Amino acid sequence: IHEANAKPGLANRLGGTFAKFTGVAFPNTPFPRATLVGMPMKDEIAYLNREAHRSKARRNLGLDPQKPTVIVTGGSLGALSLNNAVAACRDHFAEWDFQILHITGKGKAVLDENGELLSAPNYRQIEFSNGMQDVYAAADLLLVRSGAATVSEVAAVGVPAIFVPLPIGNGEQALNARSLVEASAALLVKDAEVTGEWFAREIPALMANPEELERMGAAAYELGIRDAARVMAEAVLKAAEK
């Protein structure tokens, strides 16, 4: 069994009683007899050299390859609070010395008051990206949900991030981010606090402090686990032999 979330689901809790091997993605997962293995991910992400890939990644995403970049994404389904917060800052975009890539989610394009695709200087929106390695390489700062895969990939590649846990469910997204947040390797903000005012205040302030971004990224990288796919594959093969 592999438990992805820091708060195990019922099926895995029951199955873990009989499993020959249980791997968990996060160190704070309350699972008896579990082994910390991390989250299996593609090698393109696990072993990504962000600095070497940065300029190409930004070009792939339609961005200025030389400009500092904030990327906002709620995943493939989007996140209404993140989308609304970004849209509310439209009048500020031209003032900032960084660009924003806004990944809105499939079918969640952000429109202006005329029903046209929201457009502004230093701003680009797309509905989704098939290459998350480009997203991680291009970003100087991520504003994202804290699903298990996202948190694990953020740590593996060492990208500074602000996590906004999904406000519904059983609280697993906040728990997923806990180890990074407690290590000062990432920030966590409640969904209800993410407004246009918050974005306009906090994002430019953090982007103006590249030393802090570098420190966050390095701290995240130290906590990253990059060989989970291999470890889980070996565990499955070993269990099958018994």
Residue spans of the language-model regions?
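Donor-nucleotide binding loops and adjacent catalytic segments primarily
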Residues: 53-59, 63-144, 174-178, 189-199
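C-terminal "capping" alpha-helix adjacent to the active site of nucleotide-linked donor transferases
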Residues: 184, 189-190, 194-211
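A short, well-ordered alpha-helix in the C-terminal region of glycosyltransferases
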Residues: 205, 212-226
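Conserved donor-binding/catalytic loop of nucleotide-activated donor transferases
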Residues: 137-139, 155-164, 183
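Active-site-proximal region of nucleotide-activated glycan assembly enzymes
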Residues: 1-55, 60
